[in-house]
Design a protein with these regions (language model features):
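Glycine/proline-enriched, intrinsically flexible loops and inter-domain linkers
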Residues: 1-663
């Protein structure tokens, strides 16, 4: 490639290190290009080979998860979201992703853009979002910084979701010292589409036009993917410009324009510009289609003066899409987006050479092989060193007999203390900031239902959806904790009257270069896989968020599960936890071989009343769990159950108390 006249910094190994690349990765890049990269090319490689985009430290482990099922219409990771056939010619697109690092430095915008980004993943596939969920983790509420983060995150989720017009119907909030300084903000979206009317994130057809549509591009979010691929430190506050800024009203326009364009048949391929922006969408679409692209990025609508091609390619400005369409459909495509008062600018066209070529006022500033950049192609894949953490010997050696017995006189005060602990207490302050009823499809929302139930209009069917994970269990027993995370999410869906179909996941862990962290990661994923196979809930995709650490240490390993279930008849089968009538019989449904065990390890009782995180996760057998869930679902469908509530945080005492309170 000829030298450019554009004034860019000379690329050196030291500059590559500053971009988060290792010495080996820099050497691979130079070898593949056959020359020293340009500054723009370095930026492209650094974000595409970041952990956030390449999954280089996790993909080998993720491939061990069950990723096939009769109802799955696309494989895990093949599209922007998972797609599940629910019958009657309908499919559900759903996905969960993290926005942890942005929310740690700018909680309002970090959380808001997390909501916006996951919605785009859904409607980019042609599905209309029908509900949102979230899963949140914070440090103790007596810390002013934690209260600031908590308030900002909840307001960000509420303001964006409410303005966008999709109900936030379910979620979970946990507090623990391990999350202090590094909150977890996981956002999930669910949408419905007719089978056969979906769009794909692919670039095909030599000569087809490539358009950028939606908002103008600014400097917000540059290197956001790289920022998400490193530990949070005192220097992270200086990376506030790496946090994107969202506009839910523009996103609403983009939703309608995108769905109209897909229905009009003018879209060959389309992808949201999320992490790494134009770089990621152009490279991934090209690689998937075995094609290339020629992009003239000076044509990108810009909202800031003096932007460089490096900045334009790496910007993560929100509410933007990359669209491929046939030349004969360009006028229609432009008319649709302009009708919705959105930009639609032609950047170039699809080529057959497999390379993404970036031009700046006619000058070639980047020429990179798409396949070499992407996950599943030439992006690095690492198998990290593992070591069983020493702390597990200490926690496993804990003797529950050292915990004082609870006197009868102290039982009621202890229950009240449990009910008042932040992890069990009502989250009404949170969900009252969310519009849970917009679009009028919410049958069971936050509060008395173990999972949310959302009606599919024009059908008797509904969707039961839930996010769930007990990070304390995973910390104490990673494999069993991973199993329980899947099982409890499925159990919640069953308690609401739904049949679990599939999961999406958001795997929140510490630094993968630490052998103990990677051992826990592999064990937890192994447990998840075992539970998914046993319960028949394949993995449709999701997200890995590493580097959730701060100067005080790593967060609890938190593999958040987003569970999708189908309620065959929302009027007859939807079930809540609230007791319905005096005189109803209260039963504890359990395996036939069940016996009482002193399962206080990792319990909220130990944590809230004794300040302890110790012992083993509760006794758990997958076959028994499956039998209980199948039995309960059968009883609900037979009309024999008036309410159902799973026994989890706080045990049977809290379970019964909550059913009374909900009544």
């Amino acid at each position: 490639m000829a030298a450019t006249t554009l004034q860019e910094p000379p690329v050196t190994l030291e500059l590559a290190r500053e971009h988060g690349m290792t010495d080996e990765e820099y050497a691979w890049m130079v070898e593949k290009l056959g020359r020293t990269p340009t500054f723009t090319e370095l930026g492209i490689y650094s974000v595409m080979w970041s952990e956030h985009c390449s999954y280089k430290n996790s993909i080998a482990v993720l491939k061990t998860l069950p990723r096939e099922g009769d109802a799955l219409l696309v494989g895990a990771g093949e599209e922007n979201a998972g797609l599940v056939d629910i019958g009657d010619g309908l499919a559900v697109a759903f996905k969960i992703e993290s926005h942890n690092h942005p929310s740690a430095v700018e909680p309002y915008q970090g959380a808001a853009t997390g909501v916006g980004g996951i919605q785009r993943d859904i409607f980019t596939m042609g599905a209309r979002p029908i509900c949102s969920l979230n899963s949140l983790r914070f440090g103790p509420l007596d810390n002013p910084r934690v209260r600031y983060l908590f308030d900002g995150v909840v307001r960000g989720i509420g303001d964006y979701g409410n303005s966008f017009g999709v109900p936030t119907v379910a979620g979970e909030v946990y507090f623990d010292p391990s999350y202090e300084g590094n909150p977890l903000v996981n956002a999930m979206s669910v949408g419905v589409v007719k089978v056969g009317q979906t769009a794909s994130a692919i670039a095909t057809g030599v000569g087809n036009a490539v358009y950028i549509v939606g908002s103008a591009t600014g400097r917000d979010g540059i290197h956001g993917a790289t920022f998400a691929s490193e530990e949070i430190s005192e220097a992270s506050e200086a990376k506030r410009p790496s946090v994107q800024v969202g506009d839910p009203f523009t996103e609403k326009l983009l939703l309608e324009a995108t769905l109209e364009a897909i229905r009009a048949g003018v879209v060959v391929g389309i992808q949201d510009m999320g992490a790494a922006g134009l770089t990621c969408s152009s490279c991934e679409m090209s690689a998937k289609g075995g094609a290339g692209m020629e992009l003239h990025v000076d044509r990108v609508p810009q909202r800031e003066a003096g932007m460089t091609p490096y900045e334009i390619m790496l910007s993560e400005s929100q509410e933007r899409m990359l669209v491929v369409c046939k030349p004969e459909h360009e006028e229609t495509l432009r008319a649709i987006f302009e009708k919705w008062d959105l930009h639609a600018a032609r950047l170039g066209h699809v080529t057959d050479d497999g390379r993404v070529k970036v031009y700046w006022h006619g000058e070639l500033v980047a020429d990179v092989p798409a396949e070499h950049l992407v996950l599943g192609g030439g992006a690095p894949v690492y198998h990290r060193e593992t070591r069983r953490p020493a702390y597990l010997d200490q926690t496993a050696a804990f003797d529950l007999a050292t915990v004082p017995d609870l006197d009868v006189a102290d039982a009621a005060p202890a229950l009240l203390q449990l009910l008042g602990s932040p992890n069990i207490a009502s989250k009404r302050w949170v969900f009252e900031q969310y519009d849970t009823m917009v679009r009028t499809n919410t049958v069971a929302g936050p509060g008395p239902s173990d999972a949310a139930v959302v009606r599919i209009k024009g059908s008797r069917k509904g969707l039961a959806v839930k996010t769930d994970c007990n990070g304390r269990y995973v910390y104490l027993n990673p494999r069993k904790g991973g199993q329980i995370a899947v099982a409890e999410a499925a159990r919640n869906v069953v308690c609401a009257g739904g049949k679990p179909l599939a999961i999406t996941n958001c795997l929140n862990f510490g630094n993968p270069y630490k052998p103990e962290v990677y051992w826990v990661f592999k064990e937890a994923v192994g447990g998840m896989g075992e539970a998914c196979r046993a319960l028949g809930t394949p993995v449709t995709g999701g997200n890995v968020s590493f580097y959730n650490e701060n100067p005080t240490g790593a967060v609890f390993p938190t593999p958040t599960i987003g569970m999708l279930g189908l309620v065959e008849d929302v009027e007859r089968h939807t079930t809540t936890a609230a007791f319905q009538a005096e005189g109803d019989v209260i039963l504890l449904l359990s395996p036939a071989a069940w016996q009482h065990r002193n399962d206080l390890g990792g319990s909220e009782y130990l944590a809230a009343l004794h300040g302890l995180t110790a012992g083993d996760a509760p006794h758990f057998v997958l076959d028994e769990e499956k039998a209980v869930q199948e039995a309960l679902l059968g009883l609900i469908r037979a009309g024999l159950v008036r309410s159902a509530h799973d026994v989890s945080d706080g045990g049977l005492a809290v379970c019964l108390a909550e059913s009374v309170i909900f009544s």
